Amino acid sequence: MSLLTEVETPIRNEWGCRCNDSSDPLVVAASIIGIVHLILWIIDRLFSKSIYRIFKHGLKRGPSTEGVPESMREEYREEQQNAVDADDGHFVSIEL
């Protein structure tokens, strides 16, 4: 029983590929998709934390305050802080 597959065949003491239809557009497209998938997977593994952080929080860190008077900016900051402080009351301390 041989361990050789249909693709791998010994040719004159070397291993070769018996792929006569490798110029088929479907084979070429599948190869390109496979290579792109591999590259994207490697990039994802290397930079996953920074990529997901960008998608989660976006590139901006909040609404633009350009052209807004300082008094309105301060009022907005206070409203945001009050909203955060109000949410603290929703947490329940469970002691076992």
Curated annotation (Swiss-Prot):
Major location category of this protein: virion
Job description of the protein: Forms a proton-selective ion channel that is necessary for the efficient release of the viral genome during virus entry. After attaching to the cell surface, the virion enters the cell by endocytosis. Acidification of the endosome triggers M2 ion channel activity.
Ranges of Basic and acidic residues composition bias in the record: 71-80
Annotated site location: Essential for channel activity, possibly by being protonated during channel activation, and by forming the channel gate and the selective filter: H37
UniProt topological domain (Virion surface) ranges: 1-22
Gene source species: Influenza A virus (strain A/New Zealand:South Canterbury/35/2000 H1N1)
Transmembrane segments: 23-43
PTM annotation (Phosphoserine): residues: S64, S93
Location(s) in or outside the cell: Virion membrane; Host apical cell membrane
GO biological process: symbiont-mediated suppression of host autophagy
Other noteworthy facts: When the channel is activated, one or more imidazole moieties of His-37 probably become bi-protonated.
GO MF terms held by the record: channel activity; proton transmembrane transporter activity
Name of the featured protein: Matrix protein 2
Annotated keywords: Disulfide bond, Glycoprotein, Host cell membrane, Host membrane, Host-virus interaction, Hydrogen ion transport, Inhibition of host autophagy by virus, Ion channel, Ion transport, Lipoprotein, Membrane, Palmitate, Phosphoprotein, Signal-anchor, Transmembrane, Transmembrane helix, Transport, Viral ion channel, Virion
Glycosylation sites (chain numbering): N20
Family listed: Belongs to the influenza viruses matrix protein M2 family.
InterPro entries noted in UniProt: Flu_M2
Keyword Repeat recorded: no
Pfam families recorded: Flu_M2 (PF00599)
Site entry (Seems to be involved in pH gating), positions: W41
Intravirion side of membrane: 44-96
Subunit structure: Homotetramer; composed of two disulfide-linked dimers held together by non-covalent interactions. May interact with matrix protein 1.
Membrane-topology annotation of the record: Single-pass type III membrane protein
Documented activity regulation: The M2 protein from most influenza A strains is inhibited by amantadine and rimantadine, resulting in viral uncoating incapacity. Emergence of amantadine-resistant variants is usually rapid.
Start and end residues of each stretch annotated as Disordered: 61-88
GO cellular component: host cell plasma membrane; membrane; virion membrane
Domain note: Cytoplasmic tail plays an important role in virion assembly and morphogenesis.
